[in-house]
Amino acid sequence: HNLKYESSLVKQGYFDFESGKVAARKLLNMQNLPSAIIASNDDMAAGVAFEGYENGFSIPEDISVVGFDDSPTASHMWPPLTTVRQPITEMAARATELLILQLQGGDVSSQEAAYTCELVIRSSSGPPKVQG
């Protein structure tokens, strides 16, 4: 899609609702409003959506919001959150195996794991608003 990385669009968060609100406030006050905000987890995305509504933005008509994790928050908020589902159970099992191996004196430095994630499309995302 030829999207250029713009560091001004990256905001620090702390994986909670409040830091999602703070980051959204900064992004929503920019002169060139982004068409979408992707948060590092669903709690932050919920904060983004809340801040958007508090400032008169409609989601997804004015701005799309996407989270990560597919936590219960994603399907319980309004509009339901588009998010990325990752295989938490598989990841936790593998992390546990590696921890046990390391505790037993094994070398885990060369261990790799890859997981398939799934985009769960719900109502918080849509095509960008036509400018002009």
Residue ranges and their predicted role:
Residues 1-132:
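Bacterial carbohydrate/catabolite-sensing allosteric modules
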